[in-house]
């Protein structure tokens, strides 16, 4: 599982940071999941090694402009390319009206299906938002000036590694039967012999997990959805010096993000959604936010546009 940051600034873009967007590449799939879509996100795709045509799911955290203004144009561009087989869009209830209105008033027609999923019920009732045989997505309400939601992607436990040489030594011919054995199933060969997949597989391999948490001030629900995640991506709009402003505006300081990471017992924290006031040369710069967080949670990294992170078990 890999994440790529396409926008790491809050509110407005800067010379080096675009507004919020992050891409998840699920393991062993030729598809991309986009989290938030601030203005200019499709330009960031062009500058990266990612393809718009591979987007299959889009998750929007909340309805502030720096998280959604890039979405209508991105959807229209995908339609013009004519290469999408359909997109699933997840977000707060007003998102559907926003997209429908933008497309209608610009006379834009999508050449693919766009299916919208409201997230409020899943968030408030702690239900699974999406699930297939390999992945599941959960969501939780955050604490912001308007309704805002965190997302967690869990990779399910996978079968242990298949010992091909052992299977060959037993005279099991290569082919589809290997896939059955790898799934732990029992198989019968043409000669009547029966084998259990458990004989040829190592211990089950736990999947990895990623949590995307923005915009929010410190809240227990952020801790709950982040518990024991391999990677927590959390907003860090302000320094601890602006704690009062953070509470007033519904944002987190680097200290708050680190406290959430520590209490949730995550493996790694990445800070994103930095206020444009923190630029190199100013009284407070991004590295100050990083050091602030690392004093509480040492395994912290600062996001920057086009940073790619592979999520692995520690």
From Swiss-Prot:
Q: Where is the active site?
A: 66
| Record field: catalytic activity | Endonucleolytic cleavage of RNA, removing extra 3' nucleotides from tRNA precursor, generating 3' termini of tRNAs. A 3'-hydroxy group is left at the tRNA terminus and a 5'-phosphoryl group is left at the trailer molecule
What CDD domains has UniProt attached to this entry? RNaseZ_ZiPD-like_MBL-fold
Q: Which GO terms describe its molecular function?
A: 3'-tRNA processing endoribonuclease activity; zinc ion binding
Q: Does the keyword Metal-binding apply?
A: yes
**EC number assigned by the record:** 3.1.26.11
Q: Where is Zn(2+) 2 bound in this sequence?
A: 66-67, 215, 273
Q: Which cofactors does this protein require? A: Zn(2+)
Q: How does it assemble?
A: Homodimer.
The entry's protein name is: Ribonuclease Z
Could you read off the lineage of the organism from its UniProt record? Bacteria, Bacillati, Cyanobacteriota, Cyanophyceae, Synechococcales
């Amino acid at each position: 599982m890999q994440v790529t940051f396409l926008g790491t600034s809050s509110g407005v873009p800067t010379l080096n940071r675009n507004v919020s967007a992050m891409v998840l590449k699920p393991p062993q799939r030729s598809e991309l999941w986009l989290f938030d879509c601030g203005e200019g996100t499709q330009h960031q795709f062009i500058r990266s090694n990612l393809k718009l045509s591979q987007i299959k799911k889009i998750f929007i955290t909340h309805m502030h402009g720096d998280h959604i203004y890039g979405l209508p144009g991105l959807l229209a561009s995908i339609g013009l390319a004519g290469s999408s087989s359909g997109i699933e869009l997840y977000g707060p209830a007003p998102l559907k009206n926003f997209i429908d209105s933008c497309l209608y008033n610009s006379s834009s027609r999508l050449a693919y299906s766009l299916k919208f999923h409201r997230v409020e019920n899943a968030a408030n009732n702690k239900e699974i938002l999406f699930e297939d045989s390999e992945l599941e997505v959960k969501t939780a309400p955050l604490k912001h000036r308007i309704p805002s939601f965190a997302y967690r992607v869990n990779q399910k436990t996978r079968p242990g590694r298949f010992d091909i040489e052992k299977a060959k030594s037993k005279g099991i011919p290569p082919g589809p039967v290997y896939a059955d054995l790898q799934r732990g199933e029992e198989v019968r060969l043409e000669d009547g012999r029966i084998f259990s997949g458990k004989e040829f597989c190592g211990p089950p391999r736990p999947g990895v997990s990623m949590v995307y948490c923005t915009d929010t001030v410190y809240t227990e629900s952020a801790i709950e959805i982040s518990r024991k995640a391999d990677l927590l991506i959390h907003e860090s709009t302000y320094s601890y010096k602006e704690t009062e402003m953070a509470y007033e505006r519904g944002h987190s300081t680097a200290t708050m993000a680190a406290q959430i990471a520590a209490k949730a017992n995550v493996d790694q924290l990445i800070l994103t959604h930095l206020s444009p006031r923190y630029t190199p040369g100013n009284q407070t710069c991004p590295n100050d936010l990083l050091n602030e967080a690392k004093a509480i949670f040492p395994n912290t990294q600062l996001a920057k546009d086009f940073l790619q992170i592979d999520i692995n078990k520690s």
